[in-house]
């Protein structure tokens, strides 16, 4: 057979012609596949115990439905909901949805009614993002603690004012980064990291696609001056995880970039962003976007990868496109095995811990300085981000 015909023959028969030459062991390994240990994480022994502490709290601002899970978390921890105030008359649905979830709670006449009520110890809030820090400052200056939806602060100037007020009042300015604090797989990952399951954490990688669902979005959603920009907004969830899992107390931004790829009719909007960060506890990479396709079935395929010196963890938080049902999937590889852990039974500790913090003047549920460090990082990344332009 001449060389040209030989080449044509080999191309025609393809890789199948090489199969007889492969050792039997190769087929045995491929057939056996990886041996994955399947586990189901157990709830805390006291998961159904009555809350240890109780407080009275109110809600101000209903412009993001995160306020429903924020309120529920405080109630789980022993919070008694006293009153609610809708700060946006253009959003009557916010109040209707809140009352449908929490019943016929008293509707306050105005902000002062809540701030001047000495029985109220905490205000939880989800107004339009640019209003959150000014509201939190007023709350703290009235002797109450504050729990904001993310982003809790959208400018470096607001951050400086918040830090100043915390120092002067001794009150707590908490931000509910729900993608860690209210995700069971993320809670389990924290326990594993703390126990040394993967050695020292080297890097976190967060991939956080979201679904834009444009018809449901209010005008402020498209304006970075109101919501802070994509890195400040949905990036804050992710950088909170970098700070927490690496244990960083000092950190900075190495690089950041943003783009508006798909929404020319909303020229100020940002639908893509990413950033690299580094701290005294490790490194981190974050990618955020508004490109979740309808076919996924949930709002986003959120992933977290935690690299350690002795193993790594992957979280598939809300969906597993490999076929496992539901969310809260954790995969861990260490020196001994490959493990899959179903985390749906894990107890969410934030509510009880946070109510305890309000009573005891502690920071168990969320470290105050870490929350502000995560915020500072995304604000710097947002401010200094390179604006990308792609060929249309």
Q: What are the residue ranges of the model-derived segments?
A:
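Mid-domain beta-loop-alpha active-site segment that forms a flexible
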Residues: 69, 176-184, 216-252, 269-271, ...
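N-terminal Rossmann-like dinucleotide-binding module
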Residues: 28-101
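N-terminal secretory signal peptides and thylakoid transit peptides that target proteins
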Residues: 1-17
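Contiguous beta-strand/loop segments that form the cofactor/metal-binding neighborhood of enzyme cores
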Residues: 36-47, 240-320, 350-361
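Beta-loop-alpha module in the N-terminal Rossmann-like domain of NAD(P)-dependent dehydrogenases
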Residues: 91, 105-165
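NAD(P)-dependent dehydrogenases' Rossmann-like dinucleotide-binding region
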Residues: 176-179, 195-216, 230, 234-238, ...
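C-terminal helix-rich "cap/oligomerization" subdomain common to oxidoreductases
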Residues: 12-22, 27-51, 122-124, 353-392
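A contiguous active-site-proximal alpha/beta segment in oxidoreductase catalytic domains
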Residues: 153-215
């Amino acid at each position: 057979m001449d060389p040209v015909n030989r080449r044509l023959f080999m191309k025609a028969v393809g890789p199948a012609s090489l199969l007889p030459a492969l050792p039997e062991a190769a087929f045995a390994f491929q057939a056996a596949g990886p041996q994955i240990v399947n586990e189901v994480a157990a709830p805390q022994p006291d998961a159904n115990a009555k809350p240890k502490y109780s407080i009275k709290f109110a809600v101000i601002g209903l412009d993001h439905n995160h306020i429903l899970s924020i309120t529920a978390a405080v109630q789980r921890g022993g919070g008694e909901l006293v009153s609610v105030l809708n700060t946006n008359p253009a959003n009557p649905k916010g109040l209707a949805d809140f009352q449908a979830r929490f019943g016929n709670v008293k509707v306050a006449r105005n902000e002062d009614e809540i701030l001047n009520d000495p029985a109220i110890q905490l205000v939880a809030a989800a107004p339009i993002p640019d209003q959150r820090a000014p509201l939190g400052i007023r709350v703290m200056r009235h002797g109450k603690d504050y729990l904001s939806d993310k982003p809790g602060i959208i400018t470096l100037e607001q951050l400086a004012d918040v830090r100043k007020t915390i120092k002067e009042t001794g009150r707590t300015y908490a931000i509910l980064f729900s993608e860690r604090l209210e995700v069971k797989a993320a809670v389990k990952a924290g326990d594993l990291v703390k126990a040394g399951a993967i050695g020292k954490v080297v890097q976190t990688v967060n991939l956080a696609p979201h679904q834009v669902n444009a018809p449901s979005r209010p005008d402020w959603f498209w304006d970075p001056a109101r919501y802070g920009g994509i890195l400040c907004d949905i990036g804050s969830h992710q950088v909170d995880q970098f700070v927490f899992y690496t244990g960083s107390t000092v950190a900075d931004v190495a690089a950041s970039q943003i783009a508006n790829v798909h929404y020319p009719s909303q020229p100020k909007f940002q639908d893509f962003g990413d950033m690299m960060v580094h701290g005294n506890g490790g490194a981190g990479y974050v990618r955020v976007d508004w490109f979740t396709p309808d076919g996924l079935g949930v709002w986003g395929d959120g992933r977290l990868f935690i690299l350690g010196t002795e193993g790594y963890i992957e979280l598939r938080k809300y969906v597993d496109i490999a076929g496992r049902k539901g969310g809260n999937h954790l995969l861990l590889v260490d020196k001994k095995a490959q493990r899959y852990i179903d985390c749906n039974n894990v107890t969410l500790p934030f509510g009880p811990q946070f109510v305890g913090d309000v009573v005891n003047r502690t920071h168990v549920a969320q470290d105050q300085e870490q929350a502000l460090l995560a915020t500072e990082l995304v604000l710097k990344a947002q401010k200094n981000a390179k604006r990308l332009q792609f060929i249309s």
